[in-house]
Amino acid sequence: MSTPQSEIGLIGLAVMGENLALNIESKGFPISVFNRTTSKVDNFINGRAQGKKFFGAHSLEEFVGSLKRPRKIIMLVKAGHAVDELIEQLVPLLEQGDILIDGGNSHFPDTIRRTQYVESKGLLYIGTGVSGGEEGALKGPSLMPGGSPAAWPQVKNIFQAICARTPDGEPCCEWIGENGAGHFVKMVHNGIEYGDMQMICETYDLMKRGLGMTNEEMHDVFTEWNKGELDSYLIEITRDVLGYKDEEGKEVVDLILDAAGQKGTGKWTVVAALDDGMPLTLIAEAVFARCLSAVKEERVAASQEIKPRVKKFTGDKARFVNDLRAALYASKIVSYAQGYQLMRAAGKTYQWNLNYGGIALVWRGGCIIRSAFLGDIKKAFQRNPELVNLLLDKFFKKAVSSRQAAWRRVIVKGAQLGIPTPCLSSALAYFDGYRSDRLPANLLQALRDYFGAHTYERVDKPRGQAFHTNWTGRGGTTTSQTYTV
């Protein structure tokens, strides 16, 4: 290639990389591709990319040389060391103002570090969350870019051309914030995804083991739920899974081992919440539910040792299914309320000016948690951009309050039947705790002060003053120096 022709380049031709490259080219942007295993480049150029505006490079030097300036390079390689290694190989080949874009599932602290490093070399960096899986990459993903602000105007037209669209035609891509903001928001998205899936599984379990419903009956329930306030991608595919049979007519969902896998992004979200002191209880329970499912053999053994087994439901099944619908929706509100609390805390910690309504819009299409519900979140932040918690918005306050009785009936019935509802239950516990003007933490502080002299605050004194009681008469007045009010 004698003169640079490609608007953008992409490194990493696994399925996600191929699909994203095809998406970019289909929107009118000539693109160069490279892969460490060069045979993949040839196979792609001579296969899915044949006859299209692609340039397949066999070396990084050739790849970089094929790009128009400022060069824009998407890296779709395995998160972790591989990203750092690729950056080190690319930096010497680039010039001031060129842009590196990490489109993988990188941990946001790594993106913060990489942004600082790349900027120190006179280059620009973007860490962008990409949601929607392989199909989304091809047809339109949800994109959550963050990093060097100066890079956004250079890539905005490409990103907003290839991303998904809301039903109103708005692009599901907007600038999130500096350094690691984009990957942080994608991490929270993944955590919410964990919670949504676990809550759906809990309603399925209550219908399956509690009500004794067939997969066909549950398929019909989820079909109906997807027409209303629960309309979402995950409800839609739950419906499809419950109705799916293999070539022998067997219901596939019943053949799948009940031991869940995970890639770690849910854990990252929970750890981030702990670091910021945020009560991300529902998503934490979703992560631990997967951990518990993974000890399959232990559970099977315990089921033979610990009685009684799950009881059968007696009562009005149709009414209970309606209660489940209400409990799922109310719990979903709590899950998003917690996720947004975490993003607000991170915004303060890392000095990100996050657009919370804009984030809801970005999630409205193309991504795994896309749902009609997100439109209501966007409206909530339009009403009040400084909204502290979704539970305080008039729409969501009414939505939860009107479902409280049904929500509580579901939790009680689950406990009576012996069917675990960790996420639905933790959502209700958070709701009750958040609306309590007094919690038993006063006793907790007294106990901490008793055994560790950690001190406490008093209700009759200004906040921030520390007090210690010599509870036994033998402890003296020395207090813990590690306590932070």
Regions found by a protein language model. Give the residues of each.
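Interdomain hinge/lid region at the active-site interface
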Residues: 183, 208-213, 220, 228-298, ...
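NAD(P)+-binding Rossmann beta1-loop-alpha1 motif at the extreme N-terminus of oxidoreductases
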Residues: 1-71, 94-97, 133-137
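C-terminal amphipathic alpha-helical interaction region
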Residues: 401, 406-485
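Rossmann-fold dinucleotide-binding core
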Residues: 8, 83-86, 101, 107-220, ...
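Glycine/threonine-rich flexible loop motifs
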Residues: 72-89, 104
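Small-residue-rich helix-loop
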Residues: 224, 348-380
